[in-house]
Each structure stands twice: as C-alpha cells, then as structure tokens.
Amino acid sequence: MFLETLIHGVTFCVPFFSKSARIHTLSKDVFQQRKFPGNTLWAAALNRFTAYLFASKELSSKQAYLAQDFVNVCKDASVFQNVYYYELKKNILTDLGFSDLKNSDKSLALSKSSSTFDLQKIKKIHDCLLSEYRKYVRYQERIEETRPDLQKQLTDLKNPIEWYPGARKLRRHIIMHVGPTNSGKTHRALERLKTCKKGIFAGPLRLLAHEIYNRLQANGIACNLYTGEEIRNDYPFPQVVSCTVEMCNLSTTFDVAVIDEIQMMADPSRGYAWTQCLLGLQAKEIHLCGEESVVKLVRSIAKMTQDDFTVYRYERLNPLHVAEKSLNGKLSELKDGDCVVAFSRKNIFTLKSKIDQALGKKSAVIYGSLPPEVRNQQASLFNSKSSDENILLASDAIGMGLNLGVKRIVFSDLKKFSGVSTIDIPVPQIKQIAGRAGRHNPNGSKQSAGIVTTLYQKDFAKLNRAMNLPTKNLFNACIGAKDDLFFRYLSLFSDDIPQKLIFDRYFKLAKTTTPFVVSEGALSTFIIEYLDHIKGLTIKDKIKLLGCPVLKHSKYAPLFIREIGCVIAQGKRLQIYDLKSVPLEILERGIPTTETELQQLEQLHKLIVAYMWASIRYPAILQNGAAEKTKAIAEAFLIKGISKLQK
C-alpha cells in the first residue's frame, strides 16, 4: 500500500503496512490510566504489601530503606513511567489473567463476584510483589558489593576542567556579551564570527542553528550545519559551522566560537552541554551571549581554567514597560501585534478558539511540540502585514530563537504544570518572554516600546513584582558523566541487573566540587530501561542511544526505543517504514481536521525526528531517504492542519 502526497510540486510515494499490521501494542495499554480496576487492585495489594513489610521484625535498617524506596516507585510507576516498576506492574496484572481492564471501577464493584475476586487477586499480587522485592534487594546488594573501591574512583567527577586537555593547552579569551532580550548582544558576537577564518556558532535550538546557517550563507559566508537530526556539509572547508550545543565539536581548533544563552549551563536537563562547550572548546576567542545572572559563575570558571576574561554589557535597544492595568479578561481589548502566552497546548487552543470567535479573525499559534519548521511558518504569518493572523497564541517556546514582531506580551497565566505539579513561572523566564515585546521589526523601521501585561487582574501584581525584581546570580554549572568513566562503570556489572538500578547507584556515588553539579538530566535514564536485555546491543550503543530525542511520557517511546535497539544489535539495514513502532498510518488520514488528529501527527513527527537522529549515528543500518520524505509530508500536513483549524 502506498501513500501519494504532493508537496511543493514533488510527489512522494511512501510504502505503508496495513493498519491491522501496524496497530501499536501500547495504544491499548490501560495500565497508565488511574481509573481502571487494575489500578484499584494494584493499590490495594501494594497497601497490603507495605503493611506486611514494615510489620516484619526481620527487616534490617538497610532493607527497610530499600523497602520504602521500592514501595514509592511501585506506587508512582504508572504516573512517571519508571520502566522497571511499570513493566513489573503490567506483567503481574497480565500474568494473573486480569483482562477485564476496560470496565470502570464502578461496574466492577457492582459485579456479583467482585469482592471474592478482588481478595484473591490482591493476595496473588501481594505474593508477586514480595518475590520481586526480594530480587530487588539482591540486585542492590550485588551492585554495592561489586568492586566498591573502583566504583568510587569512576564516580569521582571533582575535576571536569582536566577532561579537556586540548583546551587547557590554549590561552583562551572568554568574552561575555551580557544584556536583556533585544539589546544587540548576540548581533555583536555574530559580527565578530563573520570576520574570522574559522569559527563555530553553538545555540540552544535547531531552529536557531538553521537561522544562523541561512543568514551566514546569504551573506556569502561558507557555513555548514550540524544538529542532532540533520547534517549539511555544503563545504569541505567551511568558514563557520552552525550547530546546536550538543553537537559542538570539541576536538577541532577554531579562531572564534560563539555560544548563545550561556545561562542555560545551570539547567538541570541540558546544562551539561553548555558547560562542556565552555570547558572544552578549543578556540582562541570564546564569545558567550547571555544574562547578567551568569557573569560571576563564568568568571569563576575562567579563573579555574586560567583563561582571560572580559565582559561587555548592553542595554535594550528600545524600552520595555509594564502596562498600567491588565485586560481584565476582556478578549475584545486584544490588538494586532499582541502575543497571548499560555503554558500548555490545551490552554493555547482553548484561548485561540475564544479569541478567534471574539475578534472574528484568525490567530497564529506557536508551542513546543510543533516542529521548528512549522513554528517558523507560523511566525512568518504573524510577522507578515498581508496575513490575517495578526494575533499570536504562544507557549514559552517563543522565549528563544524566533524573530517576532510582537508589540505587546499578554500573559494568560503565571503558573504551569511541571510534569509533577503546578508551579509558578520562574522570574527569569517571565522576564525573557516579556522581553519579546517590541523585539523585532521585520520592516526595519523604528522600533516602538515593548509592552507587557496580563489577561487577568489576579496575575497583574505578580507580573509587576517579577519585572522589578533584581537579577539573581546562578551558582551551579551542570556537568554530565564523562563518557569513558561512565562506560567503565557500567561494564562492572552483570547483564542481568536492571540498568536503571545501576544508574541510580552511579548518581548516588557521584562526587563533584563547587561550582559543578552532576545533572541526572544529562542522561535520559528512562531510555536505558527500554534497552535492557537486548541481546547483542553493546554498552557503548546503549550510552549513545541515551541522547535519542524521545519524550519520557510518550506512549510510543518504549516500543520505538526497543525496536531501534534490536535493529542496531542485529545490524539489520532498513527504512523507517519497516519499523512497527512508528505509526505511519496516521499520514493516511491526510490533513488533520481536529486538535486530537493534529496532536497525533505532532507525535508522529517527533518519532520521525528521533529516527533521523539515530540514522545519523548509525547510517549503515538506519537508512534516511524515506524518513526525510515522510518528515516533509508530516510538516506539510501540520501546516495545512493548523490553517484549517484557524478558519
């Protein structure tokens, strides 16, 4: 079966499996749902198991600690998708033959045999948990007893400066360009980059790396592009390389390097990439663009590396003001050039529907799960005077990497869901988003002042306070595991021990010195669990796949990572349409007509990008041709789908 789609005058022909052959096994997985009877039984059995454990006089203090740890993670397995315990839960419920998982708790409770049935199941689950806990204790004891002295040596991360001997041989000059959004700091650094013989730009986003690549090429500068998902070697000897920070080349010598958003080095999930760029780049001049909050931290690191250090400070090119009042919830007061900021995809589309109805016009949308190419298209619509999309609905994704003709930022809320709980938006993030107001004028005319306000009065005082708070200094630079040491550490242990437990032990033992901290976010540890027990997959392959850009809570992630791991282990050459874990049948629907279909297409696009990321690292196994075509089709459908929803 083939899907034919016309995009920009080119017909793509992509083979697909039949829907019946490509149903994703996890799409029917109900174990993550909280209201199903399987979870009711699980919770009851877990309570019984907990009571048994902590009533036992045989438990040592060490085992009591492990018991509490085991119970906590079992309890949260369905919420946080901790694979080791999540699989335990799923397997136990499945093995017990409890197949009637689609009925609600209420209907189960009303069934005649429910009370007897529940008691039997609870007892069996309790027994399985007890057996599993004993295995868990044995795993922990084996980990702790395996070469403890060598474990301590391999987790000693106290001197990351010495990890980069090539950079230590150079007398580098670190030059900081510090200022708020729209102060010209990055422009100044890029002007220096244009004049060097050999340079590199490293930024936080693929979209930004593309923008610099296109801009430099338009200026006649030979520039290549390196991102996690795409490599463009247009020139054998480029003057400049534009890349994302994770792809920064630390083994080549440059005259000038520019690292954007250097304050991100304190970020728990990706900060390690900025820190390793700062410590490891072999460049005579390193220009760092960022916020005042990171100056003291970088200065202290420059002193440790014995590099020269200079700071240039910049003021905004146009003023930024907080409005006199909020909009008091009146959508009719929104004007052309406004950007309404919401912190979830659901809230963005809810607001979009209300705003489009209230104003009788379409609005553009930008949020994190949209592909960069689609975000760029929506930004162009918003910036264009000939377009009808004169109001923008956006998430915090607008904080970096897009040139937007925003006149006024309107916060719809100052809270967001962190993945665990609802939190206040951090002050630096509020300031960064607010700074987008008045940031860019696509026509090159004089820039007007930027205005920032809130949609509702309840948030207005909080916004005022945030905008007037002084900058707080950052004190920590995140580092990741050193590859060779981490490889040796993982190699110490037997293959039958769940690698998640080994990872937990590694981070527990890891030791650093100020200002460096180890970031667990530097390793997508949930991925390692999907790769457990794949025959023929080496430890080096597993470490390499830890960077695969799949979302932790994606229902497609487990099967996708496992299938990629198996393919690599077997050395089997294939195209993306050969993978059962990639639901390409979504493309058969054509252009999405509902928000649900749009979201499903976004999830498919992320899987395609993850495949392309893996194909760059395993080009002899994972072929890229069909993936590039399906990616283009998905992006075209997304653009047209958003356009349909805007009508």
Curated annotation (Swiss-Prot):
Q: Which GO terms describe its cellular component?
A: mitochondrial degradosome; mitochondrial matrix; mitochondrion
Q: What does this protein do?
A: Required for intron-independent turnover and processing of mitochondrial RNA. It is a key control element in nuclear-mitochondrial interactions.
Source superkingdom? Eukaryota
* Domain Helicase ATP-binding: from-to ranges: 166-303
Assigned EC number: 3.6.4.13
Instruction: Quote the protein name from its UniProt record.
Output: ATP-dependent RNA helicase suv3, mitochondrial
Q: Which GO terms describe its biological process?
A: mitochondrial RNA 3'-end processing
* GO function terms (MF aspect): ATP binding; ATP hydrolysis activity; RNA binding; RNA helicase activity
CDD domains the UniProt entry points to:
DEXQc_Suv3 (cd17913), SF2_C_suv3 (cd18805)
Annotated Helicase C-terminal domain residues: 326-486
Main subcellular location of this protein, as a coarse class: mitochondrion
Q: Report the family membership.
A: Belongs to the helicase family.
Sorted keywords for this record are: ATP-binding, Helicase, Hydrolase, Mitochondrion, Nucleotide-binding, RNA-binding, Transit peptide
Its localization reads: Mitochondrion matrix
PROSITE patterns cross-referenced by the UniProt entry:
HELICASE_ATP_BIND_1, HELICASE_CTER
Which reaction(s) are listed as its catalytic activity?
ATP + H2O = ADP + phosphate + H(+)
Which cysteines in this chain are paired by disulphide bridges?
none
Q: Where does the chain bind ATP?
A: 179-186
Per the record, the gene is suv3
Source species: Schizosaccharomyces pombe (strain 972 / ATCC 24843)
Give the InterPro entries listed for this entry.
DEXQc_SUV3, Helicase_ATP-bd, Helicase_C-like, P-loop_NTPase, RNA-DNA_Helicase, SUV3_C, Suv3_DEXQc
